[in-house]
């Protein structure tokens, strides 16, 4: 009997309320702090660009920073392969602990780096190397947090759990980064921010490492993984000890490919909305840091509402219909919002557009987490979910770089964004049309 035939896990391993709560909190905070660490770079991108990748053309400097962000994303599949393998073979909990602590330490290390004015061209090289290291740990966080939370969740609430962790966690991470950005902008106003403010923002990444101790001391292993190990020991099932290799076998390659159409669109939607808003507000709208941070905090709250709503909606109408609905809305409404926001001069109008963009952007990937978990059985779930998510989001994470490169000046950014969004969400809709409905298929 293969692990794909494993049934009755919920009844064989009753979910204790306290452990379910701990698992959900750990998954939510793990992903929140992971995104918090990544958002720090997005919020200080213009400053970091000038310090590590100086250029007389602002959009080129900005593109270089986003390229360094894409470097991290490219290493995330590697991290998913490493930590996903460990999570599938040895357990989710320890994989999650090591990955989250690693992200926190590597993020804080950015605050110690010398700038190009202090160390010459070794500075951007060190910056990129550290981004590579961080990417491996981030990939590990995805493979573990995106699995253990859904395996503890109640069957009829897995979609809401998906939105809460995947999108809500990202919203919390962005909210935390916005708050830290506001505090640091106040403590280090004007030119002082380019000296110490950005460094202190990176030091705040150590919050992730503190969460590691919560996980180590309060979280039990996933009931699905424990049941799998129990049945393996009894000889009633077999499970592969090479989950990554199995994912690329003929039986799973098509599943992985279709998943990528969804995760690529969801990742692009996220990085071209919540991820690009900080730079858009500064470079296109010219909003001051203190005002921008407040707008971004509001956008983060709206992003959480959107993610939980659309994740929960998928529990009622299914994952496939939710993807189709959101894809159409994104392709039509996001360009309208960005073009309108570029013309807005009133702070209230800019804020409303930013809130609408954040709402739409997080709707696009709210159900993705549970969709991916339902696509794979327990024996390869961490590896399959992690690789599907990280490869798609790695591709999506390159889009801000391409948007910046396609824009000769800040005035061209809104139209470039609109074109990229329409094209990519057509691809997303094709994927949504081709995938099967997965609601309730959890094994």
Residue spans for each PLM region:
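Extracellular/periplasmic helix-loop-helix junction of adjacent transmembrane segments
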Residues: 45-77
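Helix-to-loop junctions at the C-terminal end of transmembrane segments
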Residues: 79-91, 307-319
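Cytoplasmic membrane-interface "Motif A"-like loop-to-helix N-cap segments
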Residues: 89-101, 316-328
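Hydrophobic core of transmembrane alpha-helices in multi-pass small-molecule transporters
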Residues: 120-139, 348-363
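Multi-pass alpha-helical transporter architecture, strongest
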Residues: 212-219, 371, 422-443
